[in-house]
């Protein structure tokens, strides 16, 4: 399964996999990639000593192949609108707001000299990032860094829309537009 594979990948494996992918993309005419990066921690769920260790593997792959990269570290906190914890097999994906900000800032610093790279924000979804942490992340980056892309999955399936209505009282797009300044960023 996806989780089993994700829990086996080392930083070196990730760099090799991303390098191969990016080279294949370049061969097909792509010059840029937006990488939604979910896996942030060691297989046991503990952070690496360098917060952005796995992000750096992706940045290195982009440097090796020459593809332009927008790295989008994904914030993933809960398994549902009701705040259920992530599953055991998702432990490499989960972050607190503080740890997510560290990963983002460390990755941005790592590629600061690479003008063809950018680090944005990816909030997994309304169901996987509760409203307060979502606001905290958006406000932090609005106040403390240059303009960077912000991405959020609105809903992956109809059931998620139904859960949003039950939990937030609104459809996901409606809630997002009423609670955050959605713009070209």
What are these regions (language model features)?
Residues 1-46, 53:
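Metal-associated gating/positioning segment near the N- to mid-region
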Residues 41-185:
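Metal-coordinating catalytic core of metallo-dependent amide/deamination hydrolases
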């Amino acid at each position: 399964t996806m989780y089993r594979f994700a829990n086996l990948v080392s930083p070196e494996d990730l760099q090799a996999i991303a390098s191969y992918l990016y080279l294949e993309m370049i061969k097909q005419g792509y010059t840029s990639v937006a990488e939604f990066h979910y896996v942030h921690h060691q297989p046991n769920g503990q952070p690496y000593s360098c917060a952005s260790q796995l992000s750096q593997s992706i940045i290195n792959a982009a440097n090796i192949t020459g593809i332009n990269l927008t790295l989008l570290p994904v914030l993933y906190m809960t398994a549902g609108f009701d705040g259920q914890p992530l599953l055991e097999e998702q432990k490499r994906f989960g972050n607190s707001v503080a740890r997510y900000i560290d990963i983002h800032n460390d990755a941005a610093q790592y590629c600061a000299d690479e003008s063809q790279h950018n680090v944005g924000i990816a909030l997994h979804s309304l169901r996987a990032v509760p409203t307060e942490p979502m606001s905290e992340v958006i406000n932090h980056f609005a106040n403390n860094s240059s303009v960077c892309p912000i991405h959020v999955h609105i809903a992956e399936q109809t059931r998620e829309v139904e859960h949003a209505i039950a939990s937030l009282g609104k459809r996901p797009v409606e809630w997002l537009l009423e609670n955050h300044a959605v713009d070209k960023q």
